[in-house]
Amino acid sequence: CHNVIKQTNYQITNDETFRNRANLYLAQDKEKREPYSGETKVMHYFELLRDVVGFDKIKEKVVNPLTGRKIAAYYGCLLLRPGKVMAFDDPENPAIMEEFIRAIGAEPVIYPYRNECCGGYVALEDPDSAKKKSNAVTNSAESHGAELAVTACPLCKYNLVHNGSNIPVVYFTELLAEALGVKEDTNA
């Protein structure tokens, strides 16, 4: 999970005690492992698409624009929080997924529950609570005109789909592949 990796890297970089404990743990696998100090930049795929590839470049490469499709971006609670650590969009008023939706030719739907929790890992202990949270998200998206929802978190997708969403929920790479004209490999 991007959230766990990024938070761990942040702690290794900023907390000497944590860094020492992590390096002791890692050294168990290999005697001569170099200590890790957090020098790797952890990026989400959306950061890569926006900051390295560029949404303008993606827009240029679209061969199958998703024109007329109303898509609700679902951020959930793990993609952008804690904001100080994730630090690639505003956790209270995010825009990166809406920019992506526009780049592939669709219309983003703004709705109140787009950065609320879907139930996350709570689904393991309290499925009813996760179902209630997930349904609040998809019902909100649908009532604001969305015909489908897109997410960047596999756990969010699982919760939204398996808790009875009335609208389809897809992973963002599915929309990207569709817009770029990538054919599904049925032999994979």
What are these regions (language model features)?
Residues 1-188:
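Iron-sulfur cluster-binding electron-transfer modules in prokaryotic oxidoreductases
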